[in-house]
Amino acid sequence: MTSLDQIIDDFAFLDEWEDRYRYVIELGKNLPEMPEVSRTSENKVQGCASQVWLVTHATGDAEDPLLTFEGESDAHIVRGLVAIVLAIFSGKRASEITRIDALDIFGKIGLIEHLSSQRANGLRSMIRRIKSEAEGRLPA
């Protein structure tokens, strides 16, 4: 999977929005395919116009576990957005995930203002889902 730093660098290098959209689609194509068995209603992200599934894996410290995520979408651009979301959050501790401002990152790479309202809402739904998963893994 492409690192967040690499994604940010690549976006800075691409001047045209058509090239940036192609890059988002490429990121999605490079995302490991989620097994069909994981594409359940329980893993489906509500609030996305396209179908999006997220699976959370927790390891390590029960008080502040390390979370990794798998993601999938049936739409090319959204699948690329899933890849960026996973680059932002996957492999981090639950406490760190709750503090990350992913929308700010999408703003810095200039992508948020170029998304349709449906895609932006779906992106927010993915972020809320991941943050909710992280908050649910932390002690009350």
Curated annotation (Swiss-Prot):
Transmembrane segments: none annotated. InterPro entries: Fe-S_metab-assoc_dom (IPR003808). Pfam families: SufE. Signal peptide: none annotated. Belongs to the SufE family. PANTHER family: SUFE-LIKE PROTEIN 2, CHLOROPLASTIC, SULFUR ACCEPTOR PROTEIN CSDE. This is Uncharacterized SufE-like protein R01000. It comes from Rhizobium meliloti (strain 1021) (Ensifer meliloti).
